[in-house]
Amino acid sequence: MANVKLFDQTGKEAGEVVLNDAIFGIEPNESVVFDVIISQRASLRQGTHAVKNRSAVSGGGRKPWRQKGTGRARQGSIRSPQWRGGGVVFGPTPRSYAYKLPRKVRRLALKSVYSEKVAENKFVAVDSLSFTAPKTAEFAKVLAALSIDTKVLVILEEGNEFAALSARNLPNVKVATATTASVLDIVNSDKLLVTQAAISKIEEVLA
């Protein structure tokens, strides 16, 4: 079992937390992490690209000249693809780029990135993050006390609304819960700040 130091909100050591090696101590599988990141980035694409085909372009209902007798090539519409201003053939249409990977693959990727953060000492555990009201300045003090001045992903337990509201306006700070933290979020952060309750939830979900 891997042990990490446990801090309180003031930055003082409050003991140690024992992490489950099956989740936080595995050999990272880079191939699986890569596949999941590509999947999650694809899901973020809007996919709203669109062009007009010949039926969508305005005009072109009248045959430009008669079929025979002019010496010119036969034409049925000035909105055919070969005309300037005509419709596009086989152009992009709005679509979703999202696709799902197997649940086991997604879980292995999460375990891999969590394990990597723990191995690199970029996993900061706190006993709790409790606030009586949403206060951005108070959360900034917590980060300063914990010597966190880089891009950080804060992982909270469900229902800790005041902490989430306190952190969301800070630059380089992203907030997630134990069930919503994604592989992409974790990889994009320099450090993880995780509450003790969130650690328990992560171990419950990924067990």
Swiss-Prot record:
CC per GO annotation: ribonucleoprotein complex; ribosome
GO biological process: translation
Keyword annotations: Ribonucleoprotein, Ribosomal protein, RNA-binding, rRNA-binding
InterPro entries xref list: Ribosomal_uL4, Ribosomal_uL4-like, Ribosomal_uL4_dom_sf
Region ranges (Disordered): 49-78
Pfam families given in the database record: Ribosomal_L4
GO MF annotation terms: rRNA binding; structural constituent of ribosome
NCBIfam families, A to Z: rplD_bact
The family this protein is said to belong to: Belongs to the universal ribosomal protein uL4 family.
Job of this protein: One of the primary rRNA binding proteins, this protein initially binds near the 5'-end of the 23S rRNA. It is important during the early stages of 50S assembly. It makes multiple contacts with different domains of the 23S rRNA in the assembled 50S subunit and ribosome. Forms part of the polypeptide exit tunnel.
Assembly mode: Part of the 50S ribosomal subunit.
Record-given protein name: Large ribosomal subunit protein uL4
